Amino acid sequence: MSFNFTKDFLYSGKVYGLFYKGISVGRLEFNGGSVKITSGYIAIFPNYAPTEAKSGNILLTNVAKGSIRYSYNGADCAGWFIHSVEVAEISKLARPLLDAICYRHVYVGKPGIVANYFVDGDTSKCVVRSIEPFTLVCDPRDVTAGQVLEKNLSTMTVVSVANKVKFNPKGNLTLYIFNTTLRGNDLFDSAHHSVWDCKGGEFYRQSQ
């Protein structure tokens, strides 16, 4: 399978399953329900869902520009809230695939806060600053949700100081910055997050 990780990857909390175009690369535990990706995007689902979706089948009907829409028992619903990853749960499901994803991606986000992020950079480093604490997830084998920490990874060096994180990339990275005010059936779309590419030490905003 080929993936466009820059645009096609969303992540969330504890994992029920990881799927791509209807092909399970993990295991879904949703009271016997099933999930099918229909638009060619990857989604990882948390250990909670909208209150009306405790059982039954879920069919994803569209995953685009950061938003998820799905069909639950025939009703059209918006996507789940996306927040920081719980790495151990993901690693048990599809470690080889997630290694491939996370070696080229950095994810920043934290549930329950409204954070104003901005990015600046020079030729040697990328810096992201936040007015609030945030969660940095670089590699599912090494990083635990809720921590901001210093790690030396195979494709990047991450050095964090308080609310500042510097990236010294050895390749192109993608930074997902999430506005974390959305809950439940709110659409999670391009109006509520920014996506940046880190190329040659500088972040470039992607139009979504």
From Swiss-Prot:
Superkingdom of origin: Viruses
Q: What's the protein here called?
A: 23 kDa protein
